[in-house]
Amino acid sequence: MHTQPQSYQAPEQTHMRIENRRIEAGKGGTNLLLIIESRVDTLSINLPTLYSLLFTTNITILMSAPQHRQLRRAAHITKIASIDLCSLEEEDHEDLVLEESGHHPSDIQNEKPNRPPYSTLIRKRSGKVFRFVRPKLADLWHSRYHEASFDLGRRLGIGRRTQSCCEDVCDEEVSVETMAITALPMDVWLKERLKKWVQLSGHEGSIVPATPHTLYKKQCANCGEGRAYKNISKDPALDGFTPKYYDELEKNEEHFIEIEDLLQQFHDPTKTAIMDIKIGTRTFLESEVSNTKKRADLYEKMVAIDNDEPTEEERKCGAITKLRYMQFRERESSTAQLGFRIEAAKRLEGALEKNFKKVRTVEDVTTTFMDFFGTQRSRVRQQLIERLKSMRKAIEHSSFFNSHEVVGSSILIVFDTEKVGCWMIDFAKSSPVPNGRTLNHRTTWIPGNNEDGYLIGIDNLVKILEELPEYGEHPDDQLMVTEEVIARMKNTKS
């Protein structure tokens, strides 16, 4: 039985599809990625001709149908990733069966390199298995075999070598232009990226690198984030203000979406300052607080945070509703007052910081921003103001925001010494407004009106940035320079 893979256009890659029991590739079916895993350390690919080789982020191999037949008969080749199968017109191609196999991205965090990557298996009924990975590169990066050494233009005698490994490949020894690949059982690229990987917020391991330019984000049960991103991608007003959305997948009963890694827009993502700001006066869905049952566990949590908070009636009852607890938590931060709160940040020359629970007032936020922007304050501040004003205008004209409550979303701020970026991220709690009503995102929330205060948060964010002093106007600025120099020296020594 043939399985139709989901139509998917990967970033800067080639689109694959199944059509009439024949595997084809878009864009002429020529430029695909070839990686071989061999049972031996060094594998000489027995291809009669190597037409083209381009080594940038991938390798381009052009092959003809006879070459496919020869390669597929090589018993010592156990896995083929993203090979050009557009010319697979052999008499036995109906014997090919596509099967799904793989593991989920969280395995990468746990360093389980022996698990097979996400892929589609091409399994012959004879039992031989060839692995075909759709060309979105994610599977390759999740494999231990993404690294290979190349010996170009080397003339190799392949007859005797392959004769011992497979049947009916070559009748006599011949010399051909080919390529020797040494499969290195290591994940250098992935380890290097994970070593530099910074996840500001969310559960650890819920977001992992997928490709050099995309991320896998794990989805909770009944999460509509993929649907939200699809709707956003259809809204021209929001173009460029959110990560690009590529795919939604399910593995082992777990759901993931693949989105753009915004940090890859910067020259060196490891040398960027990053801040996650939760936007809105409400960070919970109405459905989450619809239950009016009073709970003792929530009362205990409230008392642990602030023993003076409970009312006399609540103390007698020893229990509170979820709505009461959530509103209390939001008053503890700047969410209720300003319509946003700082979740996490990493300074340009500093470590990740997540302890912003005491940042509540305008003065607290101002001090935090000054520390975060450092000596880049004047430049970053001005560019952020312009970007946020453009974002605000886009939201006001957005069909998506007009018809959706957007709860728990964040503004992601990223900058380095040359560039400043600002985007909206996290749409897991976005949902359509019932009964065709529209939202303005500035009206005060009352149960039932679905208003989220998104624009209240952006309005206040812009206002605070506009009132932020230029660099050099504050007494602490000279101290800031000294701290940055010390931090830079420490990083250089390490």
Curated annotation (Swiss-Prot):
The keyword DNA repair does not apply. GO terms for biological process: inositol phosphate biosynthetic process; phosphatidylinositol phosphate biosynthetic process. It catalyses: 1D-myo-inositol 1,4,5-trisphosphate + ATP = 1D-myo-inositol 1,3,4,5-tetrakisphosphate + ADP + H(+). The keyword rRNA-binding does not apply. Signal peptide: none annotated. Probably by regulating inositol 1,4,5-trisphosphate levels, negatively regulates posterior body wall muscle contractions required for defecation and let-23 signaling pathway that controls spermathecal dilation and ovulation. May also regulate ovulation downstream of actin cross-linker fln-1. Belongs to the inositol phosphokinase (IPK) family. This is Inositol-trisphosphate 3-kinase homolog.
